[in-house]
Amino acid sequence: ARLEECYGRHFWGFADKSPLSETYTAACAGLGIIGDNHLLINEKYGSFVFIGEILSEVPAEELGYDGREPVTGGCLHCGKCKAACPMTESGMDCLSAVTQKKGELTPEEAAYIRKYGSAWGCDICQTSCPLVRRVTERGTKTPIEFFCRDRISMLTIERVHEMSDEEF
């Protein structure tokens, strides 16, 4: 509402489901490079970032956009992310996509989730990336306290059974 008051135009916010390619758009905005794992790699936070967009009726030039293309290069193209991915040989989607799938899992999908112990998401390609490792080795943490609070480093079936609906 404040943006609309300031500019006198309409604005729309998006995250995860967007009419734009979030990674490409973020790279065009200078927020990082696109890795071979198709994730944005930010110099300060690596690939552990959340991307959101604000679209508006305001011409991009009025907001300072100069029409640049995304930064190319940066990714080492070393193949470590693809080599580490547990789904490469299966021909299935990324394990993160499988864990977030709506509806029933196939027996093969369920087997991969069990094998890799993933309840939600997968960071294997990210943690194998040398560029992301540099960031984590520097100890860079998110400034958003919410993401650090009450983290569970190892999820067990016992822990799941102990959780309230809210915790889950």
Question: Model regions: which residues?
Answer:
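Glycine-rich phosphate/pyrophosphate-binding loop
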Residues: 149-168
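Catalytic cores of enzyme domains
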Residues: 1-154
